[in-house]
Design a protein with these regions (language model features):
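Divalent metal-binding segments
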Residues: 2-12, 17, 21-280, 295-351, ...
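Short, glycine-/Ser/Thr-/acidic-enriched flexible segments
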Residues: 16, 36, 44, 61, ...
Length: 629
């Protein structure tokens, strides 16, 4: 507690987990001028209210610091969000295809229907992708583009016509066009040896006009707020040129319409021109320029293309060029001389080892201490590399890519190799700066609770037990990875990440108790209330009337966001997609989930109005027809 000025906002009757070691729990907080001005008991905080203070009764619910994503492609994702049909969190291919059909029916020519990553075939009960025949049957005339992680893309016949791929199209560098016996493209594109063909093909699609991009970015932030995200570090991305592709996010920042605090890194765009990019950017941009809502965070995740080790575990580990070190050293010296931190994409330990050789060499001439540089991903990092990073004062930003690619990793390298991939717990034990994020929106979903679930349970979204319990994190550790730990990676330690007097007032009220709910429920969490800088940016249920930031309807009027909203198609009637596929399966299945005593009668049971009809309930989940036959 302190003696603050009259607060703008008080939240009370809650159960706050503050992450402040000197004051770990509270029931009330006060906010003044965007920062926490008091954290304590109701008895201490409520008397501070003045006539204009807004008060929100949390009704005994738990509250947490706002979640911060250490690696999110928000700027690029925001420009496209309103055009994309999201299969993130959809449990069955049957439902995914029903969504696709519904979107095809409302999408006008010449627009595409596009599913751009964020899902894996393993999340579906069918454990497969749609066939090209299925896509063509659903959409004979509307172009459909489906990106699966960064390993392949599926195009229907209409999409092949739209992009101009024919029998005469030459095989592109950085990819493979699968063809039939006559040499005609089938519609399957493979990322072999990298994803260049996937990027290039997607770029051929229509783009949203400028005002729609502004609206789209607001809706993407809104979806993140719904999931409890209050901040992120943007990692740049392919086809995201600076400053051209930053004008929309800058416009929103200038208009005070950002509902996510965003630190951004600059990603080089053209091979062999990386040095020129960073010479130009370090002379025209200043590290940390901006505000607490939108600020420059240095370089990366791409520093030089010769160091890019593609993360497709369905393909062999790539061999980096022998001249990589020279190109990387040129760029790192520029960054170190200008005191710009950097982040570097590195999937494999071999890449990390070679990059560390460069960093250690530069450190001999230009000390790297205090630069807060770090590696991204680091799935196969070794203990030796962890120690070298710690010695240089660096960090590791991990993401939940293995929750989406774990099955493929195990197929190629074996289950034992996946037990600590990446070795998050070991890095924490060694005291390395480490935090968590998603790498959304393509190679994984933007849902932070999927990441938190993966950190705690060690399971993929397909249910594979990837990480043994001894290598998993506690819920306290996982939450810190998504809050206070991330502030080192944006050089904002002490400014945010905790519910503590003086820190930025970013917090969430989740729809369940993160510390008490079953592990299997963590991934299904969303926010009832999200507060950024003392402003309610998302409110649902009992808190809907406090919402101050709802954007206008998604544009264009055929946008998938209008119908499906986002993760798990939550915009449709709650539970409807899962109920639909289960009932369809029940009518045709011969599964072994029936009651051993009373037999198998899914169709009868799940069509009834009795408790077995509730697929989320005990009896319905088991498939027992005891009460219905």
């Amino acid at each position: 507690m302190t003696q603050p000025t009259t607060p703008d906002l008080i939240l009370f009757n809650g159960r706050f987990t503050t992450l402040d070691r000197s004051n770990p729990t509270a029931t009330a907080v006060a906010v003044s001028q965007g920062r926490f001005s008091a954290v304590g008991s109701d008895r201490e905080v409520l008397p501070l209210a003045g006539p204009q203070t807004k008060r929100i009764d949390l009704g005994g619910r738990s509250a947490l610091p706002g979640l911060i994503d250490n690696h999110l492609h928000l700027i690029r994702g925001g420009l496209n969000f309103n055009m994309e049909l999201r299969w993130d969190g959809v449990k069955s291919l049957t439902d995914a295809m029903a969504m696709l059909k519904a979107q095809v029916d409302v999408t006008p020519a010449p627009q595409w229907v596009r599913v751009v990553g964020g899902f894996t075939e393993h999340q579906f009960v069918e454990k497969r992708l749609p066939t090209l025949a299925e896509l063509n049957a659903v959409a004979p005339d509307t172009p459909v583009f489906i990106l699966h992680l960064y390993d392949r893309a599926l195009l229907n016949a209409a999409a092949l016509r739209a992009v101009g791929y024919t029998k005469d199209t030459p095989e592109p560098p950085g990819g493979q066009i699968l063809r039939d016996s006559a040499g005609n493209p089938t519609g399957l594109l493979l990322a072999k040896p990298n994803a260049s063909i996937l990027y290039a093909t997607l770029a051929k699609g229509p783009k949203l006009p400028r005002d729609y991009q502004v609206n789209s970015t607001r809706h993407f932030m809104r979806e993140l707020n719904r999931l409890g995200v209050t901040g992120a570090i943007d990692a740049g991305g392919g086809m995201q040129n600076y400053p051209d592709d930053y004008d929309v996010i800058q416009e929103l920042a200038d208009a005070d319409q950002l509902t996510i605090r965003l630190a951004y890194n600059l990603f080089t765009q053209k091979p062999k021109e990386e040095k020129d990019d960073f010479l130009r950017w370090t002379s025209s941009s200043q590290y940390k320029q901006g505000t607490d809502y939108f600020r420059h965070n240095g370089a990366g995740e791409m520093l030089v293309f010769s160091a890019a080790d593609f993360e497709d575990f369905r393909q062999p580990q790539p061999e980096l060029a022998p001249g990589m070190e020279g190109e990387l050293e040129e760029v790192v010296r520029i960054l170190a001389q200008n005191r710009w931190p950097w982040r570097m994409h590195a999937t494999y330990d071999e890449t990390i080892d070679r990059a560390l050789n460069v960093f250690e060499k530069v450190n001999e001439d230009i000390p790297l201490a205090g630069l807060n540089w770090f590696f991204d991903h680091a799935e196969t990092i070794s203990e030796k590399s962890i120690d070298r990073i710690a010695a240089l004062g660096g960090g590791v930003a991990v993401q939940h890519r293995m929750a989406y690619q774990g099955e493929y990793f195990v197929e190629r390298y074996g289950a034992a190799a996946a037990e600590a991939t990446p070795p998050v717990k070991r890095m924490l034990e060694k005291g390395v700066n480490v935090s968590a994020g998603t790498d959304a929106t393509r190679v994984a979903s933007y849902n932070p609770w999927v990441s938190l679930s993966w950190l705690v349970t060690g399971k993929t979204v397909g249910g594979l037990q990837l990480t043994p319990q001894r290598n998993c994190l506690t819920r306290d550790q996982a939450l810190s990875m998504w809050t206070e730990n991330i502030t080192w990676f944006s050089n904002e330690q002490g400014k945010k990440g905790r519910i503590q007097v003086g820190q930025l007032a970013d917090l969430i009220v989740p729809d369940r108790d993160f510390f008490a709910c079953p592990e299997s429920d963590i991934a299904d969490t969303s926010a009832l209330l999200t507060v950024v800088g003392g402003k309610v940016v998302y409110g649902a249920g009992a808190f809907a009337d406090f919402d101050e930031s709802a954007p206008p309807l998604a544009m264009p009027d055929w946008s998938p966001v209008r119908t499906f909203k986002g993760y798990g198609a939550w915009g449709v009637q709650e539970g409807a997609p899962l109920q639909s596929v289960m009932r369809n399966a029940a009518a045709n299945c011969g599964c072994a989930s029936s009651c051993n005593m009373h037999g198998h009668a899914h169709a009868t049971a799940w069509s009834s109005k009795l408790p077995v009809a509730d697929l989320k309930g005990f009896w319905g989940a088991l498939g027992c027809a005891c009460w219905a036959v």
